[in-house]
Amino acid sequence: MQKINELHPIPLSRLFDRWRVDIVGLLPITPKGNRYIIVAVEYLSKWQEAKAVTEVNALSISNFLYQNIIWRFGCFTHLHIDKETEFVNEIMERLTEKF
């Protein structure tokens, strides 16, 4: 029998404050060389942002966050990234360099 995990509510504070980032791919290559899609979903409004990229690394994710989230909606206080956990520290370092 499979163990059932307990659900935990996510506290919400203000609009565009908490984002979740996921990576879609490896997809068929596009004419521009893109093979992945970075997708961000805001927890409260469920607003979505997405961008096709050629590779997934700390630079591409931090550029996506800076250009598509921070410039449009302001700084967030919470960021949830599942698959690319090895990039989290470098992503945050790159974002803080931009400020």
Segments the model singles out, each with a brief description of its role:
Residues 1-99:
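Retroviral integrase
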